[in-house]
Amino acid sequence: MKLKTLILSAVAAAAFAAPALAQSPAAWEMPKKGDWIITGRVTDVFSEADNAITTAAGADSGLKVDVGDSVMPTLGFTYFLTDHLAVEAILGTTKHEIRAQGGATDVAVHETWVLPPVVTLQYRPLTEGRFSPYVGAGVNYMLFYSGEDKNGFKVDLDDNFGYALQAGADIGIQGPWNLNVDVKKVWVSIDADVNDGALKSDVDLDPWVVSVGVGRKF
């Protein structure tokens, strides 16, 4: 996880928001029923997948899957159903390199863009103060597009649904502005076929989605 990158991005986002904050002298107030928070984030999506790559007959090839990290900007849209319950959807896309590794082999086989929308229902226990922690649960859909095969391999990835858990917090700054820290864990598995099924893998992507950013309440 590129933690240093995320921290530096959060500092940059806060600096970018500073002029707007200077024009918002009012104290930050907890969001209430009917409010929106739109959050711009820097997000690191990383998977620890290391599933085996097998032959069409199911024999172990000696290779495993490796999926690269990706840090990209994302947007979060949160609507408050009540003072304590909110629905969040995230919008963003990330690019990942897929490698086959094992023994002396370490080769890139595919690079793909992923659209991984996540929708969660959040519970927020606090209604006063500047610190608004939350937990949530929801669903995810992994959509792969604009894939590029590498080094003579042909890779097909199946889209699939998954589910997610979430924890995070909004920290009030002033006026409608807040800092946001958010962590999601997504559980999703996909089928990957290599060279028209000559090789295959059931890949447990199960990515972590770690974000920092600045939000505005409407």
Positions of PLM-derived features:
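Outer-membrane beta-barrel translocator domains and adjoining extracellular loop/strand segments
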Residues: 50-57, 99-106, 145-154, 191-198
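Contiguous, function-dense segments enriched for cysteine-driven chemistry
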Residues: 94, 112-119, 124-126, 158-164, ...
